[in-house]
Amino acid sequence: MKKLNSFVLDITVAILDFLYRGRDYQRFWVLEEIARAPYFAFLSVLHFRESMGLRGPEHLYLMKQHFEQSVNETEHLEYMESRGGNTYYIDRFVAKHLVLIYYWSNVVYYWVAPRLAYHLSYEVEIHAATTYAKYLADHGHDDKILEILNDELEHSRELEQAMEKIK
């Protein structure tokens, strides 16, 4: 299944690369819009599991982590909006439809195979960090982009910890 995760991510990245070539902040805005979806999905499933009496020992830790991650991704999203990332209707249209698919896919995936859902999100966070690093290499230093890059790397470490907690 990890190969499927990589395949799906590679296809999505190729599409985004094509659509957003030379449009960095629009691409970043779409990535940040999408980046929140798994954390919302994970929280939804954790709340549902709790309501069904299926809470595990890691439950509260994971809920706190995912809430903090979703807030952090929202801060990134707002920054990209301030840089004009959501100016065009087509970008908002693409992002909202990708989010809809990605959210519901993550709800099902997290319910059925949470470690694999975390792995996919881990790969997405690594891709985001790589994208920001490439931007910095091409455009020079930008404190806010560097901060966001470091946040994405921190999210990837948190996702690794989550995978360990639910063994």
Briefly describe each language-model feature range.
Residues 1-167:
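Non-heme di-metal
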